Structures are given as structure tokens and as C-alpha cells.
């Protein structure tokens, strides 16, 4: 299959193919323009993969441009986080990082040009009056009493705005288009507003800041963007995008195309609601492993490759649709099943004493991956005292239970066959210690007498086990569409985080956060980037071995 044939086909790529074939464009230039007022989430990853992926596939360019036109909400912290996320996903932007604030001087001159053409005016309606004058979807708006000011007066007032002569909220620059337009975005939209706030790039040079719709199209044009890709909520804004570029002296006129945003079940994408989760301490922070932020997914153990594959699988369309969480989880399972080294961890330990074995360690060679010899092997200690998981033992059980039962045998992973002989209990009747015998001739082989041992369980040596905090992360919400609830916080899954104190094998002593392991029979886990350190290990569950929510949904 050729590289072109391997590309995911969608309507945007078809448009690009047609533009290149017709000679409308000789190259492709896209951009990813986030506002630095928060952390990127999985929905942004879709846009990143689309814009950077197109540039890569067509040997074009993709700019990283920060839409930094609101100094009140923006911060360098978010700038650095976004740059880190884009790079972590595996993409490189063309040239230097760009900022809309780089173009503030030019944007101001284009605003003056619109005033000189009689296409913009300084309005002094209050925000409340402006909303009243705007009209509704079924009723036209009405003209501001300041709409017919002369060019000279508007130029003077706009300069006064720039000089700080108006208080915030008392004046703004508006485009003069059509207050009766059926599209509210075209009813004399605001182009500039006043904000007395220090900007993270330009400092205190400006006290007036351009609006997104004015800035976005001009920035695209100044950078020579060929295909400006936005989500569907900006579809009506395309009319204003074109109006601005049609009415200023600029050579390049990019075309905007819209695609559906990502709606992922069991999560929310609203920046306001995500911020509420953080500020109300429902989650630990923006990088909480339950959050849909890229930093949260990274801390949870998701790989960049799995997120890119997810974006490839869901595709790009114009139709809004809900994507099942299992689609994302399937991508990380597929990736980790192939690439994650194996290790053993006991999350709910019960002590096992092997009575017919002398104390003393024996080092067993275990493969790091059962299907990939190239991943090598590791040495794991075995001794006469081990931990197994409490769920792997029953005093009585039916034939469907394939683990350890009193009086019966089970195989220890990559080790020996053991038989449960007797138990020791506490005053409440809980098993505290399990006494077993082992067959010394069954190391990685069947019993010599031909008896069948069906079950296999994992274990760790008591003398060598490393204590670890195991954080069992799950979906943050317990309904598919939490945003539809009257109070989305009422749909929080109370079991989205369960903490266990367990033990892991010694090979994990130096586990690092950017490496995810399969804890055999438990799931995929990574060391927590914030808290885990040698001697105080903390592991986050990335995803279980199988989807347990599908079964819940049918109950």
C-alpha cells in the first residue's frame, strides 16, 4: 500500500486534493491556534492530529499559534503546557511559535482601515444595552445610536480607546454590517474591547484587545494559511471571517472549513466545567488521571501513539456524534498489550506459607512479554513465603472457579504448582495466612503423574516484595452524558478512584512514569509522575485488561 493510500480519507483531505490538483494551491499550510487559558484535552488532540497530520502527509507546514487576545484569562503556564502536549503527541510546528499578539500593530491598522471605509464605528452602548439591541434568532436587532458617527469622530474615539481614555465596558469598536442579518454573528460584531490588564507577551503596551473573530482570519492571512480548520460551532463565524478579509487590504484569503468536535461518552469537554472540577477539588488538578486533559491522560499512562490512533479511528466528519469511551480504551489496550512489559503485583494481599519448602530465595527467569522475545527477560525471586491476591483463594468454590481452593491445586505464574492445605483466621473469621505445599518438580512444566492443574495465579515473594500504593482509576462519571444532567457533579462516579496498599515485584523498584506495565491479570499501570519515587512507589491504573462497563450497561 502506498503512503497516499494509507492516509485516512475525509472530506477535508478531498478538498485539499482538489485544490492541489486544480492549482488553487501549490502547497498546504495549516495551523493549530489554541487560546492559552487552560490545558488541552482529548478534543484538542483531534484537532492537533488533523492539522499537523495533514501538514505531514502533504509535506506542508503547520503553525502553532497562540490566540492570546484576552490577557485576563491567559497565562504563560498554559503556553508551556500546550507546547509540551503538542510535542508529546509527536508533532513539530513549523518555524517559531507564533502569537496573535505578534500582529497587534497590524490588526490595529486594519481596524483603522475599516473605520476609514465607513465599515467600523466606536459604540458607547453599555453591555446590557448592546445585548438588548442585538435582537434574537427570530427578531432583528436595531441600530446603535452611535452607528452613524463620522469617520473622523470614530478615528479620534478609537485612538482615545487605545490611549486609555475610556473605562472598561464603556466603549468598543464594532463592525458596521447589518443589524437585521439572520445571522447574529453579523449584527455589527465587536472588533475591539477595552481591558486594562498586563499581557503575558506585550506587557502593558495595549489596553485594547481585538476579538477572536477579527484576529483569527487576519492571523491566518498574514501567515499564508491555505486551509483554516475549525469545529462546527464556528460555522456561522465563517461569514464574518470572509467579511473581514474581503474588506481589508490583504493579499491572502484563506478558506475556513468546519468539522465536528469530539463528544466522548462518560466525560466532559467544557473548559468551564473542567475548571469547576479543579476549583471545587473534585479532582486533584488539571493533570488528575481521571481528567480528559492530555496531561491527565499522560499521567494515567496513555501513550501518544494510542491517542493518535484513536483520532485516526474516529475520523473527521461534519456530523456531530458521540464516541464511546470503549473506543479510546480499546486504543490504549491494543497499544499496551503489544508494547507493555509484564510484571506481577498483588493488590489485596494474603500471605502464603509453603510448608514443604525450605526458606531461601530462588531466582526465576520470566519473559518481559509472552509474545515478544525481543523484549527480553527479568529475574524474579521465589521463596517459601509469598503473597497472592485474596480474590484468588476460596475455601469452597464451584467448578467454574479456576483459582486456588482449599484442598486443591493451582499454578503460580512462571513458577510451581501449589496446593492449599489449611488456613489461619483472625477473630472475625478472615483468612490471614494460607498454608500450602508445592510440587518441586513442576517449575514451568506439568506434574509428572499427568494430573491436570487448570488455574494460574500471580504472586510476589514476601521477602522481596515492594510496598506500593495502587490507584485504581476508573471513569470519572457514571453516566454516558454527564453534561446533560441538571447538575453534572451529581453524576460523579464514587468509585472513580479506589486506593489499595499492595506489593509489587522488585523489578519495579525504579519504575518511571513514562513507562507503562501490564500487572499480570490486573491491568495496565504506570508509576505516578507526581508522587511515585524509589522507596515510596505509587502506581496508576491506566486501563483494565477488559471493558467492565459494557457488562454494567446491560444489567
From Swiss-Prot:
Top-rank lineage group of the source organism: Bacteria
One Pfam family hit: tRNA-synt_1c_C2
Keywords: Aminoacyl-tRNA synthetase, ATP-binding, Cytoplasm, Ligase, Nucleotide-binding, Protein biosynthesis
InterPro entries: aa-tRNA-synth_I_CS, Gln-tRNA-synth, Gln/Glu-tRNA_Ligase, Gln_tRNA_ligase_bac, Glu/Gln-tRNA-synth, Glu/Gln-tRNA-synth_Ib_cat-dom, Glu/Gln-tRNA-synth_Ib_codon-bd, Glu_tRNA_lig_a-bdl
GO MF annotations in UniProt: ATP binding; glutamine-tRNA ligase activity
Residues holding L-glutamine: 67, 212
Cystines in this chain: none
Family (UniProt): Belongs to the class-I aminoacyl-tRNA synthetase family.
Name of this chain's protein: Glutamine--tRNA ligase
Organism, as annotated: Yersinia pestis
Taxonomic classification: Bacteria, Pseudomonadati, Pseudomonadota, Gammaproteobacteria, Enterobacterales
Amino acid at each position: 500500500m502506498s503512503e497516499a493510500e494509507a492516509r485516512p480519507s475525509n472530506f477535508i483531505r478531498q478538498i485539499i486534493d482538489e485544490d492541489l490538483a486544480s492549482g488553487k494551491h501549490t502547497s498546504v499550510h495549516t495551523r493549530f491556534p489554541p487560546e492559552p487559558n487552560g490545558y488541552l484535552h482529548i478534543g484538542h488532540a483531534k484537532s492537533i492530529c488533523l492539522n499537523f497530520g495533514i501538514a505531514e502527509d502533504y509535506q506542508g507546514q503547520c503553525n502553532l499559534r497562540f490566540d492570546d487576545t484576552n490577557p485576563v484569562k491567559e497565562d504563560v503556564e498554559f503556553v508551556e503546557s500546550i507546547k509540551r502536549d503538542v510535542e508529546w503527541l509527536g508533532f513539530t510546528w513549523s518555524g517559531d511559535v507564533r502569537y496573535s499578539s505578534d500582529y497587534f500593530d497590524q490588526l490595529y491598522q486594519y481596524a483603522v482601515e475599516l473605520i476609514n471605509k465607513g465599515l467600523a464605528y466606536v459604540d458607547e452602548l453599555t453591555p446590557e444595552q448592546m445585548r438588548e439591541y442585538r435582537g434574537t434568532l427570530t427578531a432583528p436587532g436595531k441600530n446603535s445610536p452611535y452607528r452613524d458617527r463620522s469617520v473622523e469622530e470614530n478615528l479620534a474615539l478609537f485612538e482615545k480607546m487605545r490611549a486609555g481614555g475610556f473605562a472598561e465596558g464603556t466603549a468598543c469598536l464594532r463592525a458596521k454590517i447589518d443589524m437585521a442579518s439572520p445571522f447574529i454573528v453579523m449584527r455589527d460584531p465587536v472588533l475591539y474591547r477595552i481591558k486594562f490588564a498586563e499581557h503575558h507577551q506585550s506587557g502593558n503596551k495595549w489596553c485594547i484587545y481585538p476579538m477572536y473573530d477579527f484576529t483569527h482570519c487576519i492571523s491566518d492571512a498574514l501567515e499564508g494559511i491555505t486551509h483554516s480548520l475549525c469545529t462546527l460551532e464556528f460555522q456561522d463565524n465563517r461569514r464574518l471571517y470572509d467579511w473581514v478579509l474581503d474588506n481589508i487590504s490583504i493579499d491572502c484569503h484563506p478558506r475556513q472549513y468546519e468539522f465536528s468536535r469530539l463528544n466522548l461518552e462518560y466525560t466532559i469537554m467544557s473548559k468551564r466545567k473542567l475548571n469547576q472540577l479543579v476549583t471545587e477539588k473534585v479532582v486533584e488538578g488539571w493533570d488528575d488521571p481521571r481528567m480528559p486533559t492530555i496531561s491527565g491522560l499522560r499521567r494515567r499512562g496513555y501513550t501518544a501513539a494510542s491517542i493518535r490512533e484513536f483520532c485516526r479511528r474516529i475520523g473527521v466528519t461534519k456530523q456531530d456524534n458521540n464516541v464511546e469511551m470503549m473506543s479510546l480504551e480499546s486504543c490504549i489496550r491494543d497499544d499496551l498489550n503489544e508494547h507493555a512489559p509484564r510484571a506481577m503485583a498483588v493488590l489485596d494481599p494474603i500471605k502464603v506459607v509453603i510448608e514443604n519448602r525450605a526458606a531461601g530465595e530462588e531466582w526465576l527467569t520470566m519473559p518481559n512479554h509472552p509474545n515478544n522475545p525481543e523484549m527480553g527477560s527479568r529475574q524474579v525471586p521465589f521463596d517459601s513465603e509469598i503473597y497472592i491476591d485474596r480474590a484468588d483463594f476460596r475455601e469452597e468454590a464451584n467448578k467454574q472457579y479456576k483459582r486456588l481452593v482449599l484442598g486443591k491445586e493451582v499454578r503460580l505464574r512462571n513458577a510451581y504448582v501449589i496446593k492449599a492445605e489449611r488456613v489461619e483466621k483472625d477473630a472475625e473469621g478472615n483468612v490471614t495466612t494460607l498454608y500450602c505445599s508445592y510440587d518441586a518438580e513442576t517449575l514451568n512444566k506439568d506434574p509428572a503423574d499427568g494430573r491436570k492443574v487448570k488455574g494460574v495465579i500471580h504472586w510476589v515473594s514476601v521477602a522481596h516484595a515492594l510496598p506500593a500504593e495502587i490507584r485504581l482509576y476508573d471513569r470519572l462519571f457514571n453516566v454516558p452524558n454527564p453534561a446533560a444532567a441538571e447538575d453534572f457533579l451529581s453524576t460523579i462516579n464514587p468509585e472513580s478512584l479506589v486506593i489499595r496498599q499492595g506489593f509489587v515485584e522488585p523489578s519495579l523498584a525504579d519504575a518511571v512514569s513514562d513507562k507503562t506495565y501490564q500487572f499480570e491479570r490486573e491491568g495496565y499501570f504506570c508509576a505516578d509522575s507526581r508522587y511515585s519515587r524509589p522507596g515510596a512507589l505509587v502506581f496508576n491504573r491506566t486501563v483494565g485488561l477488559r471493558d467492565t462497563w459494557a457488562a454494567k450497561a446491560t444489567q
